[in-house]
């Protein structure tokens, strides 16, 4: 179970960095970069939701 929580925390940290990059790109009016990072953020959000579903079901990652 600790492995699952470590994986979730790692993903959350990655998403936090991506969100900071999105904010920076928007401030710099680099909308293409912001868009790419938002797509990656959405993909990671899907992965995070799946990992949380596995933890809730008791499936170990």
Curated annotation (Swiss-Prot):
Coiled coil: 7-57
Keyword Coiled coil: yes
Lineage top rank: taxon: Bacteria
Keywords: Coiled coil
UniProt-recorded name of the protein: SPbeta prophage-derived uncharacterized protein YotK
Native source species: Bacillus subtilis (strain 168)
Gene expressing this chain: yotK
């Amino acid at each position: 179970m600790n492995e699952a929580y470590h994986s979730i925390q790692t993903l959350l940290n990655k998403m936090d960095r991506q969100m900071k990059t999105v904010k920076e790109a928007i401030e710099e009016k680099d909308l293409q970069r912001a868009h790419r990072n938002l797509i990656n953020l959405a993909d990671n959000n899907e992965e995070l939701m799946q990992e949380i579903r596995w933890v809730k079901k008791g499936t170990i990652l």
